[in-house]
Regions:
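C-terminal outer-membrane beta-barrel translocator/porin domains of Gram-negative envelope proteins
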Residues: 236, 246-249, 257-377, 393-395, ...
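Outer-membrane beta-barrel translocator/channel fold
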Residues: 73, 86-165, 310-339, 454-458
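Outer-membrane beta-barrel initiation region
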Residues: 22-106, 112, 193-194, 203, ...
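Residues that define the transmembrane beta-barrel architecture of outer-membrane proteins
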Residues: 42-44, 56-60, 78-80, 92-96, ...
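Short loop/turn motifs that connect adjacent beta-strands in outer-membrane beta-barrel proteins
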Residues: 31-42, 70-79, 105-111, 174-182, ...
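Transmembrane beta-barrel strands of outer-membrane/channel proteins
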Residues: 50-52, 62-66, 82-88, 113-121, ...
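Transmembrane beta-strand segments of outer-membrane beta-barrel domains in Gram-negative
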Residues: 32-33, 114-116, 123-300
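Outer-membrane beta-barrel "beta-signal"
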Residues: 433, 438, 461-475
Length: 475
């Protein structure tokens, strides 16, 4: 009883408002497999968005989930789902999201659409090809040391301003036995990098209110500006552009449920076609392969082993740099950037690993240590341990194409990195609050293995680790 009171207090603090529009009879239904309330009708979850991401800072804002479970026959999967979010981060980012997913409006077709706007005043940019691009961890650490005021804040060295507008509409239809599906969609995106005065950052804003000795000097160029000067990033694509993309794919899905699966396979293969004639500024053609597997060790969602394998590839040897840090999605989700960060490789710095081709994995052991019903809601708490990893398998061209007077500094920079990338691996764990199998709040911490490496070329190259408060499962 005491434990339940404590948990009730925690839930009340985390979920200040949860509304359900359904009849009284539906509240009494329970599933045969385990005691669980079958949700019907509309379930609304307006919440303050208070979270933390080591890459973006504290998040303040609001979000709204609307789930339509209809007569309950599809529970725990909703018939349709709306999601709205407006968030502001203390490190200078803003995020606005509207997404909609519907399984019944078009007979036999799942329709998903989303529009997102991200404004990053100082987005992480560490260069290309993983460990080939050296990260000066010591200078960053000294700049943050309040006991050593003689070193300026070095973090802007690895930042660039970016505005990203993404819109998409996807359709998924059955091919065989509601397990094999076709996928097709149109994705539009607009990226604006840097500023019109041709530099990565607005240093006046970056240095505002800083002590004079901590000001990032104008003579210290960010990596993004150095890459332009050396010709690694061409002026034709440096400042962003438009992507007009058709996505085609196949999906194999045998999951028992979508929000928090405990058994089944979820595998996808996608083609991304962005030709010039469709309006793309810098045309490219890419592909993506993803395999996810959920293995029940103890039934009824108690203990689950889950893993994801992903490969993001490029046809040919050219793709605009601003499309590289994404794991491709088609369907109810939407693209999120950062090979490194909560949605990709937990524990390493956001966008740390970028290349034309990248392989990654995520492995988790998920344990739900308590399940109960409270206030007509299905509540669960879970723990997980994980390991994530990624590596560049086809490099972005980092050859020198600039003015010869800059070659010496380019050679010195390249000499600091490795001759090729190696696996970036992290370990970590976390706690999850799960309501009605769909609304999930996650608290996780990831630590890069490179932090403990004895090789000075690798040690601390992925950062110090990161703590996240976010929503959902990674996969």
């Amino acid at each position: 009883m005491k434990l339940r009171l404590i948990l009730a207090a925690v839930i009340a603090a985390m979920l200040p408002l949860s509304l359900s529009a359904q009849d009284d009879n539906s509240k009494e239904q329970t599933s045969k497999e385990k005691k669980e309330i079958i949700k019907t009708g509309y379930n609304l979850g307006p919440l303050p968005a208070v979270a933390f991401d080591a890459d973006k800072g504290f998040q303040l804002g609001a979000l709204l989930n609307i789930y339509d479970f209809g007569d309950g026959s599809t529970y725990p999967n909703p018939r349709q789902h709306w999601y709205f979010e407006a968030s502001f981060f203390t490190k200078g980012s803003q995020l606005f999201v509207i997404s909609y997913d519907n399984k019944t409006l078009i007979p036999g077709i799942r329709w998903s659409s989303a529009i997102t706007l991200t404004n990053d005043k100082a987005m992480d940019f560490y260069g290309f090809n993983g460990y080939r691009a050296h990260y000066n961890h010591d200078a960053v650490a000294l700049g943050k040391d309040k006991q050593n005021p003689d070193n300026f804040i070095y973090t802007p060295k690895y930042r660039v301003n970016r505005i990203a507008l993404l819109a998409k509409t996807d359709f998924v239809g059955n091919i065989w036995d509601k397990k094999l599906f076709w996928e097709a969609g149109y994705h539009f995106s607009y990226f604006k990098q840097g500023y019109e005065n041709k530099q990565a950052l607005n240093l006046a804003k970056i240095n505002k209110n800083k002590d004079p000795e901590k000001v990032f000097p104008e003579t210290e160029e960010p990596i993004f500006d150095l890459y332009r000067k050396w010709g690694i990033i061409s002026e034709d694509e440096a400042w962003g552009g438009i992507n007009s993309t058709v996505r085609l794919g196949l999906l194999y899905d045998t999951r028992d449920k979508e929000g928090a699966p405990s058994r089944g396979i979820w595998a996808e293969g996608h083609l991304m076609l962005a030709p010039k004639w469709l309006g793309t500024t810098n045309p490219y053609y890419r592909y993506s392969l993803t395999f996810r597997h959920y293995v029940p060790i103890i039934k009824n969602d108690v203990l689950t082993f889950a893993y994801r394998l992903n490969y993001e590839g490029t046809f040919g040897n050219k793709a605009p740099y601003y499309v590289l840090p994404y794991i491709t999605t088609v369907g109810q989700s939407y693209d999120r950037d950062g090979m490194g960060g909560y949605r990709t490789i937990r524990g390493i710095m956001r966008n740390r690993v970028q290349g034309l081709d990248m392989a990654s994995y995520n492995v988790e052991l998920r344990w739900r240590f308590v399940n109960f019903s409270l206030w007509n809601q299905n509540i669960a708490f879970g723990l997980n341990v994980f390991s994530d990893g990624t590596m560049v398998t086809k490099e972005y061209d980092m050859s020198f194409k600039g003015d010869e007077k800059y070659r010496a500094e380019y050679d010195a920079y390249m000499a600091e990195g490795l001759d090729k990338d190696r696996p970036h691996i992290t370990l970590g764990g976390g706690l999850r609050f799960i309501m009605n199998q769909n609304f999930i709040v996650a608290f996780e911490y990831g630590m890069p293995v490179s932090k403990f490496s004895k090789d000075p070329m690798i040690k601390n190259q992925d950062g110090n680790g990161a703590f996240y408060i976010n929503t959902g499962f990674l996969f």
